[in-house]
Amino acid sequence: MLVRFACCATLAGALLMPQGARAEGCAAQISKLMSKDTEKLTTRYNRITRQIQERGSSPRLVAEECRIARALTPRLQGQLTAIKESGCIKDPQMGNMIADIVRGHEDDLAMALKTTARSECR
């Protein structure tokens, strides 16, 4: 009985450890991929967009929005590509969180592309 319990415990440990280690590896990998500069730019872009909605557009705010959107677009594209290529989205423990990050980045990228396509930003 004791031998059977020890074998079961060893097997369970062997099965559970790689997933835990993989989740930690994915967390570290995603942490490296997420750029603080990109997050700061996204925050500034959202703040400027909110100001335009609340106060109305001014040439200065529109110019700032366009400048930030042009700088933000390649960074978001790069992060999205790297996150998708990492394979961490398939991880059972991290997959949902990473899918949320990808969706958020895709939404931010769509807004930035929409902004840069406007005639005021050309």
Q: Where are the predicted features?
A:
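Bacterial Sec-dependent N-terminal signal peptides
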Residues: 1-5
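Bacterial N-terminal signal peptides
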Residues: 6-14
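Extracellular/secretory pathway and lumenal proteins
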Residues: 11-12, 29-31, 70, 92
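Residues at the start of alpha-helices and the adjacent loop-to-helix junctions
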Residues: 13-15, 58, 80, 113
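Immediate post-signal-peptide N-terminus of mature secreted/exported proteins
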Residues: 21-64, 117-122
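Compact alpha-helical subdomains of small soluble proteins
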Residues: 67-122
